[in-house]
Amino acid sequence: MAGRSERLVITGAGGQLGSHLTAQAAREGRDMLALTSSQWDITDPAAAERIIRHGDVVINCAAYTDVDGAESNEAVAYAVNATGPQHLARACARVGARLIHVSTDYVFDGDFGGAEPRPYEPTDETAPQGVYARSKLAGEQAVLAAFPEAAVVRTAWVYTGGTGKDFVAVMRRLAAGHGRVDVVDDQTGSPTYVADLAEALLALADAGVRGRVLHAANEGVVSRFGQARAVFEECGADPQRVRPVSSAQFPRPAPRSSYSALSSRQWALAGLTPLRHWRSALATALAAPANSTSIDRRLPSTRD
């Protein structure tokens, strides 16, 4: 197991995952440099060369995550999701640092050729739909080509459940209201509580796993409709207010996979503890007041 003497370097520290990862690392008293995307533009190769040093463990949380916006901003999406990670990988390889690159379930399309869907393994064939998905897969490929010892971690349906714009946060607010809420029932995946994901990434950093593509998501599979009803139940609202509809009733610029649940089997085989079941994680996320799940955007003190 790798020691805690290594400096943890977090990119995208102002985002949903990056801010929670930074907060968790601070609570654990780790030596850390956490920089927001405004402080560190990962599309600038000189920045990576300047910041990353020998022995660092870099966790790349920086990403262009506007799935629909990527359809009209392809160049930006590829710059942040593919070229930027490549710069990080090259810098890590050059100085002798480690790299954990966060990717997405969007690299899969849910087509099992008529067979019964089952959670995707890291070795399953990818088939990204849309600009965002293609840019994230390109990032994975660029990272591993530049630095084969890097670790790529795919996750899915990440949420805080707080005051933000993630699915659970939105459903939580709707549960407090009245009337019917229509939610698609033909998109199935692995909801992942951001706090659990942050802890999983730190465990991976400590384990020193290299040169692998792994999946890290809360256990279990559910549709968006089922997830929404679970949110209502946890909030004490009537789950019958949530009604199933098809994705065709909510057309979006970018396509969504019909099924993108992720298997944790390889995560466990790597000696890591799989994340708990999604329903247990959801209960934890919703047990606290909504505003308490939002991270203070002022980053904890870090040192160069």
UniProtKB/Swiss-Prot annotation:
Protein name: dTDP-4-dehydrorhamnose reductase
Coiled-coil region(s): none
Keyword terms of this UniProt record: Carbohydrate metabolism, Magnesium, Metal-binding, NAD, NADP, Oxidoreductase
Record-marked site positions (Could provide a fine-tuning to achieve optimal pKa matching between active site and substrate): 104
Cofactor details (free text): Binds 1 Mg(2+) ion per monomer.
The keyword NAD is annotated on this UniProt entry: yes
Primary role: Involved in the biosynthesis of the dTDP-L-rhamnose which is a component of the critical linker, D-N-acetylglucosamine-L-rhamnose disaccharide, which connects the galactan region of arabinogalactan to peptidoglycan via a phosphodiester linkage. Catalyzes the reduction of dTDP-6-deoxy-L-lyxo-4-hexulose to yield dTDP-L-rhamnose.
Binding, NADH: 15-17, 41-42, 63-65, 132, 136
Annotated catalysed reactions: dTDP-beta-L-rhamnose + NADP(+) = dTDP-4-dehydro-beta-L-rhamnose + NADPH + H(+)
Family statement drawn from the similarity comment of this UniProt entry: Belongs to the dTDP-4-dehydrorhamnose reductase family.
